[in-house]
Amino acid sequence: DEGPKSDCKP
């Protein structure tokens, strides 16, 4: 998912 939390996904 795009967004500030996208960097939390592998």
From Swiss-Prot:
Further details from the record: The primary structure of the mature peptide is identical to that of cryptide To27 from Tityus obscurus (AC P84676).
Tissue expression notes: Expressed by the venom gland.
Name this polypeptide is given: Cryptide TyPep-5
Key word Protein transport present: no
Keyword Secreted included in the entry's annotation: yes
Main subcellular location of this protein, as a coarse class: secreted
Record keywords: Cytolysis, Secreted
Function: Causes weak hemolysis. Does not cause mast cell degranulation, LDH release and does not have antimicrobial activity. In vivo, causes intense edema formation and intense pain, when injected in mice hind paws. It also induces discomfort and anxiety in mice, as it highly increases rearing behavior (but has no effect on locomotion).
Subcellular location(s) per record: Secreted
GO biological process, one term: killing of cells of another organism
Species: Tityus serrulatus (Brazilian scorpion)
Listed GO CC annotations: extracellular region
Transmembrane stretches, start-end: none
